[in-house]
């Protein structure tokens, strides 16, 4: 038997009719809550819907129907307003299910992940835990990780504990930025570095598998510009709690469900970073048939008006446009009624507002810009400008071409509102000042990035000092810029890094250990994050990040000012 999207058409009419009966029964029960037969009829319809979806093997749709059925079964007759949330979740589940099946029928493609928000809404209403993003995803979790490169200096237990705690602190600072969605991608990069360093510190063994895959997942999020969903913030918050267990437990083993969620993010992004590629190739992760942003867009469409509603609205607007076109034809031929121009102005204004309300903002704006011209015609009683009349006709034709998007559920991005008139001078002055400060900050960030690249090249070349020739001067320039901006503490820390490179790497014959070079990179990364977070532009700053940088500089054996 043919199953899935291809077989939906065989049962479509009966399935959609049953869904309509379930929706009607639920709506009537909300109005007549003492009538248990109405709710029972909705439950029976849901049972039939679930059975049909099971028969044609639409797994995601069947799961949503199953969750809705369980919730409906638990709702008693005569419920009070305290159950309104559950009834609303049921209604939304049926609505989303119908929209999803419409899309499956139209596109012949199943994406059950689109239904997870509705499924979790029903589960939440029923007091059940949410399903993870990776629920419909599968991957092997028992594949051993490849051996990592051994570090040249094995830290003592005390050193390992201190470094690990510092890396967890770095992770927590980045996590706070992720949760608040402040300085988002630099925060993720800070978290990724912390996990990568923890993996290296603990020898790249099975115990640190969570750090290895977690660093790859964060690299994938940054590369793929994945959205900061609530579920992802919760995932990385759970990882922070796991890090605590990792640091105190020699036999620590990461929970398999966390590894699966992280692998899903790697597969979803299809990023090309070195860690992402290594993890993806080892686990055989194939690219997913959708992107994160596609899921977001399609989920929004599922919760929007249905196709039938949009078709009806499109038809109504087309009829309005046909009337406008007829009126323009009469005006052009000079046989219009005396009040035609006034009526035309009113009709265009109404259409402009309607188009804006349904998301066709460019079409609405096209008509809005014509209103002053038509208003002038109405006041004078004559359309005396053939070129202007032609421009209006072009605008109407453009709108007509855009209205077809309603039936496809397409949306347009709303443009930002322009600045208030009369405030241009003040806005320009503030803008110029901000631009000047931003230039200094960008130069400082570039200097720190140059230093990090130079240190990497120095390490890879086995201590070739030519790679460091310009670094101390570059960092001293960064120090001066920060001092100029009033960031004395950050300036002193950058100066400390410059002194370390000059005195311990350039002027001495012995190359520092890889561990010390990583600590130097930690300090520069923390300072870079401080700048990327815009702390220099905000009076309150980010003292925790400077504390982290200060701890790294102190670990280098340099004096640190309080």
Curated annotation (Swiss-Prot):
<dbReference type="GO" id="GO:0005737">
    <property type="term" value="C:cytoplasm"/>
</dbReference>
<comment type="function">
    <text>Regulates multiple virulence functions including type IV pilus (T4P)-mediated assembly and twitching motility as well as cAMP-dependent virulence gene expression. Regulates intracellular cyclic AMP (cAMP) levels through the activation of adenylate cyclase CyaB. Also functions as a scaffold linking FimV and PilG at the pole, where type IV pilus (T4P), the Chp chemosensory system and the CyaB adenylate cyclase interact.</text>
</comment>
<keyword id="KW-0963">Cytoplasm</keyword>
<dbReference type="GO" id="GO:0000160">
    <property type="term" value="P:phosphorelay signal transduction system"/>
</dbReference>
<dbReference type="InterPro" id="IPR036641">
    <property type="entry name" value="HPT_dom_sf"/>
</dbReference>
<protein>
    <recommendedName>
        <fullName>Scaffold protein FimL</fullName>
    </recommendedName>
</protein>
<comment type="subunit">
    <text>Interacts with PilG and FimV.</text>
</comment>
């Amino acid at each position: 038997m043919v199953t899935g999207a291809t077989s939906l058409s065989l049962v479509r009419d009966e399935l959609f009719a049953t869904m309509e009966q379930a929706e009607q029964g639920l709506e009537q029960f909300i109005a007549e809550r003492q009538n248990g037969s109405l709710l029972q009829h909705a439950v029976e319809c849901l049972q039939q819907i679930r059975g049909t979806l099971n028969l044609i093997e639409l797994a995601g749709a069947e799961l949503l129907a199953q969750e809705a059925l369980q919730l409906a079964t638990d709702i008693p007759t005569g419920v009070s307003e305290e159950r309104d949330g559950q009834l609303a979740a049921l209604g939304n589940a049926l609505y989303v299910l119908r929209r999803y099946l419409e899309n499956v029928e139209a596109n012949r493609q199943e994406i059950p992940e689109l239904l997870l928000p509705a499924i979790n809404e029903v589960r939440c209403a029923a007091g059940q835990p949410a399903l993870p993003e990776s629920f419909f995803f599968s991957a092997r979790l028992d594949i051993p990780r490849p051996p990592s490169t051994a570090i040249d200096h094995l830290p003592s237990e005390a050193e390992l504990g201190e470094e690990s705690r510092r890396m967890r602190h770095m992770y927590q600072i980045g996590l706070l930025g992720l949760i608040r969605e402040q300085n988002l991608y630099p925060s993720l990069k800070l978290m990724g570095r912390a996990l990568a360093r923890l993996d290296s510190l603990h020898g790249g063994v099975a115990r640190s598998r969570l750090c290895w895959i977690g660093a790859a997942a964060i690299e994938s999020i940054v590369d793929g510009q994945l959205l900061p969903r609530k579920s992802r913030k919760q995932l990385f918050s759970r990882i922070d709690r796991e890090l605590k267990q990792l640091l105190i437990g020699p036999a620590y083993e990461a929970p398999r469900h966390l590894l699966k969620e992280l692998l899903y993010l790697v597969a979803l992004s299809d990023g090309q970073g070195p860690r992402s590629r290594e993890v993806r190739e080892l686990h055989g992760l194939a690219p997913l048939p959708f992107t994160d942003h596609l899921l977001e867009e399609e989920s929004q469409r599922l919760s929007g008006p249905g196709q039938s509603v949009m078709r009806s609205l499109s038809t109504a607007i087309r009829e309005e446009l046909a009337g406008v076109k007829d009126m323009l034809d009469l005006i052009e031929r000079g046989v219009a009624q005396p009040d035609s121009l006034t009526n035309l102005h009113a009709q265009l204004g109404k259409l402009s507002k309607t188009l804006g309300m349904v998301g066709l903002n460019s079409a609405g704006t096209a008509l809005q810009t014509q209103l002053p011209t038509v208003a002038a015609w109405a006041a004078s009683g004559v359309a005396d400008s053939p070129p202007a009349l032609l421009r209006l006709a072009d605008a109407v034709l453009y709108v007509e071409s855009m209205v077809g998007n309603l039936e496809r559920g397409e949306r347009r991005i709303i443009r930002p509102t322009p600045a208030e008139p009369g405030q241009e001078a003040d806005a320009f002055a503030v803008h110029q000042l901000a631009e000047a400060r931003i230039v200094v900050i960008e130069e400082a960030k570039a200097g720190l990035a140059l230093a990090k690249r130079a240190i990497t090249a120095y390490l890879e070349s086995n201590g070739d000092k030519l790679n460091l020739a310009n670094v101390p001067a570059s960092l001293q320039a960064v120090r001066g810029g920060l001092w100029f901006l009033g960031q004395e503490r950050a300036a002193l820390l950058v100066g400390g890094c410059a002194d370390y490179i000059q005195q311990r790497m350039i002027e001495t014959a012995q190359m520092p250990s890889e561990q010390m070079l990583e600590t130097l990179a930690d300090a520069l990364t923390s300072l870079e994050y401080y700048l990327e977070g815009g702390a220099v532009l905000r009076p309150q700053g980010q003292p925790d990040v400077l504390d982290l940088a200060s701890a790294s500089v102190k670990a280098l054996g340099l004096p640190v000012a309080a």
